[in-house]
Amino acid sequence: MPDWLAQLLITLLKAVLVAFALLTTFAYMTLIERRLLARMQIRVGPNRVGPLGLLQPLADAIKSIFKEDLRVTLADKLVYTLAPIVAIGMALTAFGGIPAGPPKSLFGTDPWVYNLDAGILALLALTSMGVYGIFLGGWASGSKYPILGGLRSSAQMISYELGMGLSILGLLMLVGSTSFLRIVEWQALNGWLILFQLLGFALFLVSSFAETNRTPFDLPEAEQELVAGYLTEYSAIKWALFQMAEYVNMITASAVMATLFFGGYRGPVFLEGLIPGISGWPLIWLILKIACFLFLFIWVRATLPRLRYDQLMRFGWKLVLPVALANTLLTAAFLAFGRGAGLWLLGLLSLAGLLLLFALSDRVRALWNTPTQRRGAETAWVRPLGGDG
């Protein structure tokens, strides 16, 4: 067998395995999320299908497959059908570039589907293209609520994609590469990048919630405002494909944060000298880090209310983008003038920037209000109880 054909078959096999792992994780993520939300809300949650409710994802899958696939009269049939395929296709493709271990550690092959020198840029491009599935699904439905949800998704993606890119630009300048593998190797030598880019991580985390359309940024499908947003006219397997795309994007965002800021598939450096062979558990470390971020996504959904649309846009353009730009300039200044002082200085500066944001939290909160609300807050007086003013 020619080498190129063998390599192609191996790549296809790895792609199938990654897709299977992601879709299986999605299925049980829905169950875990429902059970955790129920526990946080003092409920029981789904526990009737199978032992301890573990077959609930299978029941949901069977139900979605065999439900009637309704078609809207005014819908564009081709685009209406292709939109969920585009969404899930981009989500699955984006995850394939994230390394799950060192080179040649997966039965003599590389533990990734593809490895690009511009890996992080390719991933940002793929995740950005996923919004086309949402927008096209809303537009093709031929209904006002879906098109509003699609437009919201497009505006939200544009607003937070810039901040997300700038939030990791300082990290990329520090490492000197856009390859995921080299970023992990750099952290093995110098320490996790969360220590030196704390402000960038906070901005990337917020942008990840917005990019995945999760609470408090789930405006494209706001039930109280848009029925179900871009999902209003979808049912059966098409609706399930959109849900798959959302959860796969959550998993991808968690894997990216683990890789960029927490050492990726490598365990904590201080443990490598204490526990023999700990560096031989790359996949386990990556899964544990992804699980922590997925729990954070669920926790935030159970805790925070949804932002208004004007608050969402104002927060992205007036806070996330300027602070991300400031973090980039701070890192550039350190590389130009303070490199000799050591990386700890950059970590302290990043921590100081984050603490400054918390200290100015009242000013930050004012960005969420409209000009009329801000003027009202400035001129308000405490009125006596029961008085007319």
Swiss-Prot record:
Location(s), subcellular: Cell membrane
Free-text function comment from the UniProt entry: NDH-1 shuttles electrons from NADH, via FMN and iron-sulfur (Fe-S) centers, to quinones in the respiratory chain. The immediate electron acceptor for the enzyme in this species is believed to be ubiquinone. Couples the redox reaction to proton translocation (for every two electrons transferred, four hydrogen ions are translocated across the cytoplasmic membrane), and thus conserves the redox energy in a proton gradient. This subunit may bind ubiquinone.
Coiled coil regions in record: none
Chief location bin: membrane
Reactions catalysed, as given in the entry: a quinone + NADH + 5 H(+)(in) = a quinol + NAD(+) + 4 H(+)(out)
Membrane-related topology note: Multi-pass membrane protein
Keywords: Cell membrane, Membrane, NAD, Quinone, Translocase, Transmembrane, Transmembrane helix, Ubiquinone
A GO molecular-function annotation: NADH dehydrogenase activity
Family: Belongs to the complex I subunit 1 family.
Membrane-spanning intervals of the chain: 8-28, 78-98, 120-140, 157-177, 189-209, 255-275, 280-300, 317-337, 340-360
Broad EC category: translocase
InterPro entries the UniProt entry points to: NADH_UbQ_OxRdtase_su1/FPO, NADH_UbQ_OxRdtase_su1_CS
Listed EC numbers: 7.1.1.-
Any GO BP: aerobic respiration
GO cellular component: plasma membrane
Subunit comment: NDH-1 is composed of 15 different subunits. Subunits NuoA, H, J, K, L, M, N constitute the membrane sector of the complex.
Family matches, as PANTHER family: NADH DEHYDROGENASE SUBUNIT 1, NADH-UBIQUINONE OXIDOREDUCTASE CHAIN 1
This protein's record includes keyword Membrane: yes
Name this protein carries in UniProt: NADH-quinone oxidoreductase subunit H
Alphabetical list of Pfam families matching this protein: NADHdh
